[in-house]
A protein has these predicted regions:
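C-terminal ends of transmembrane helices
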Residues: 1, 50-63, 116-129, 167-180
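N-terminal transmembrane signal-anchor/hairpin module of polytopic inner-membrane proteins
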Residues: 1-106, 110, 207-236
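Alpha-helical transmembrane segments
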Residues: 23-52, 93, 131-236
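Hydrophobic, well-ordered secondary-structure scaffolds
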Residues: 98-141
């Protein structure tokens, strides 16, 4: 990453394909220790597409529309093929006797929006050294703890692999950063956190499903909303 303006925190060129190290570390761990059912294989396929897109974007600077379309495709794979969907969530209306709200035909688009939204949310906070990988580490460790407490070992193994990859990369990304994760790493982390949060929380523990992912990923979600508002206000 070559600093081209005064807004850049770094003054010297810094490699920005560090996300490949995160992805490689995670993939090795999950292939050795993970439990690869159809849903997880679909998630890994979608993640591979996200990583490939990130590499091309880091090297060639792809257009936003193309990236958005590819991200939708990557999100649709586990949703449509792996049956990874937000089918219901807790009804927060105190006047209603219905404990859950069923999304029905809206489950597929709602889940794709969730995955693409969180993928880009983590990408947008990757502006300061160590911020995105730090937030992702905290989110992964929190999901790991929830999975262990609820006895969901496949999710626990997945989150342990993701947290380990993040923590291993973190010393090289803290200020002053020696390497950046680039879009390759940030979008991969966002994609994995978004998909696994559905697998581990939404489908099996509906009571905490809506609250926990938003609490864990609150910083990138609100940062994304703030960035969108600022860009719209500035006419960009």
């Amino acid at each position: 990453d070559v600093p081209k303006d005064a807004r850049r925190m770094h003054k010297k060129p810094i490699p920005r394909l560090g996300g490949l190290a995160i992805y490689g570390g995670f993939l090795c761990s999950i292939l050795i220790f993970g439990q690869l059912d159809e849903t997880m294989l679909c998630v890994l396929l979608g993640a591979a597409i996200i990583v490939a897109l990130g590499i091309f974007d880091d090297v060639l600077a792809l257009g936003a529309k193309l990236k958005f379309v590819v991200q939708i495709v990557a999100a649709a794979i586990p949703v449509c093929i792996g049956d990874l969907q937000i089918g219901l969530f807790t009804n927060l209306n105190p006047l209603s006797d219905t404990p859950f709200v069923h999304l029905g035909i809206l489950a597929v688009p709602a889940t794709i929006i969730w995955i693409v939204g969180i993928t880009n949310a983590v990408n947008l906070i990757d502006g300061l050294d160590g911020l995105a990988v730090g937030v992702s580490s905290i989110a992964a460790i929190t999901m790991l703890a929830v999975a262990l407490l609820t006895g969901n070992m496949p999710i626990a193994i997945t989150m342990a692999a993701l947290a380990g990859a993040c923590i291993g990369f973190m010393p090289y990304n803290l200020n002053p950063a020696k390497i950046f994760m680039g879009d390759t790493g940030s979008t991969f982390l966002g994609y994995m956190l978004a998909t696994v949060s559905i697998m581990g929380l939404f489908k099996f523990y509906a009571v905490i499903s809506f609250a926990v992912p938003f609490l864990i990923l609150g910083l990138p979600i609100f940062d994304t909303a703030n960035a969108i508002i600022r860009r719209v206000a500035a006419g960009r």
